[in-house]
């Protein structure tokens, strides 16, 4: 566990993957991982316990060392899934959770360490990396934000930006932003494969 903080991990894997045209969770993973989901969970296991995977109803997933939580309704966006994950993490005793997307093939435990360090210093509700833009789905969230998310969702909000705007959020500028790379298209996937070759 990072800095002895009770830290859960939440992987958002239930997105529609419209630009990719197929489920990102089952795309080939880097560094020997069979799939992206297995890779991301493997990174989180190094710093987080427990780990929750937020998935779409009926979405086929590979076997991973994580608890799978299915969305009740498909296509609601990341905010409701994050809220459900934070609630599960709070019930498991975690004060913070690292929330990330499944499509992060360069994710590293060092990113989590940097976020935990700032959270420990500031007690912020949200700590998010910034590299010219904010990365909501590679951030640390306090688990007690689940109720605030419920209120935002009840009011019609679906974007993570709504939560950030309603929270005490701290940003950290990362010297190495490649850990934040994600894959949204087949071209992104090919570029990643070429970079690894």
Curated annotation (Swiss-Prot):
CDD domains of this UniProt entry? MobA
Q: What class of enzyme is it?
A: transferase
Q: What is its EC number?
A: 2.7.7.77
* GO cellular component terms, A-Z: cytoplasm
Q: Which InterPro entries match?
A: MobA-like_NTP_Trfase, Molybde_CF_guanTrfase, Nucleotide-diphossugar_trans
Q: Which GO terms describe its molecular function?
A: GTP binding; metal ion binding; molybdenum cofactor guanylyltransferase activity
Q: Identify the residues that bind GTP.
A: 12-14, 24, 71, 103
* Chain segments annotated as transmembrane: none
Query: What GO biological process, any one, is recorded here?
Result: Mo-molybdopterin cofactor biosynthetic process
Name the cofactor(s): Mg(2+)
Keywords, alphabetical: Cytoplasm, GTP-binding, Magnesium, Metal-binding, Molybdenum cofactor biosynthesis, Nucleotide-binding, Transferase
Subcellular localization, per the record? Answer: Cytoplasm
Question: Which residues participate in Mg(2+) binding?
Answer: 103
- From which domain of life does this come? Bacteria
Record's catalysed reaction(s): Mo-molybdopterin + GTP + H(+) = Mo-molybdopterin guanine dinucleotide + diphosphate
The function of this protein is: Transfers a GMP moiety from GTP to Mo-molybdopterin (Mo-MPT) cofactor (Moco or molybdenum cofactor) to form Mo-molybdopterin guanine dinucleotide (Mo-MGD) cofactor.
Q: What is known of its domains?
A: The N-terminal domain determines nucleotide recognition and specific binding, while the C-terminal domain determines the specific binding to the target protein.
Concerning HAMAP family, the annotation shows:
MobA
> To which protein family does this belong?
Belongs to the MobA family.
Designated name of the protein: Probable molybdenum cofactor guanylyltransferase
**What organism does the record attribute this protein to?**
Mycolicibacterium paratuberculosis (strain ATCC BAA-968 / K-10)
**Which gene is annotated as encoding this protein in its UniProt record?**
mobA
